[in-house]
């Protein structure tokens, strides 16, 4: 992969690499991959998300669904609106809290759609760890608020409030939570971590994985020698924390991933770990630390169990295509575009193709939701009565 980098970028990566190397040395020559990923992405002032860089969109490293089309956010509104209306009906603030809002495109499209529908949202809060992205979010939302004369209060928070009543939203967040890697050797699973050889990061086998940490399918499946995959204790803990702190309302996330049986399929020999840079993906996570985004697919079964551990009302999983179609994305497209005018409708059609096609984002990306005390807001309704979540539950 041919990458042209500035001297500043090279120096940035070198400094972060040195810091990670020092960490490895201080830990006896080996660290879990989750620690490497944490430093590569989030080391203050140096990690991929902590340092300023153009990460999203055409000129960035990857493009998310909100960047493709405002239809994505408009369709999500169909799911959120009944919950927001229920909050207002109970005399509570109608509020959305978004984690990792990227460039702010999703927030903008949601607020624009709510404005078109005549609904005044009380609060739209964002939790964002990237200073660069937070600035871009503020600029975009301030401009939108001025153009539409919005009355919604937008704020940037450091943590999710306890006993939150409202909607929690996260698009492509869980995939960037550090994961642990493991390898199958001689009939046993071992932690697969990071070490150093000639000042280069290398994979190195660690201690055996405790059986209690392994999904049942990894204990009973037939795996080939050298099979590698991931575990997601931090991501599962994050979902569990969301469930604990959501008092009343809805949690909705969209991300790429698989159910457990597909995630740990014996033929998926090298797991799902990828590094992204300027719309290219490679499997070497040690290449230019701090300049590549590191991700792994979400394993949805354990996410669901984490949510259910806090006694949520309902948990739901479907693919992105089914979610968006049930949320009315096709009808919304016809509202804003004229199919008889190919010049204006072709971009809309192209974005729909990418969002819905099984070969693009339609199947790999999933919509995962859970609710808490939804009946308090929407009497005699369940999670599966909300637009977008009325199809087959894949959990």
Which residues make up each language-model segment?
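Rossmann-like AdoMet
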Residues: 1-99, 103-165, 336, 350-395
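A residue-level signal for conserved active-site and pocket-lining positions in enzyme catalytic cores
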Residues: 40, 168, 303
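Short helix/loop capping segments that flank catalytic or ligand/cofactor-binding pockets
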Residues: 49, 176-179, 262, 377-379
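Short, glycine/acidic-enriched loop or turn micro-motifs at the edges of active sites
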Residues: 131, 174, 258
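Conserved protein kinase catalytic core
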Residues: 134, 165, 177-178, 261
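A mobile, often basic/glycine-rich helix-loop segment
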Residues: 167-216, 266-276
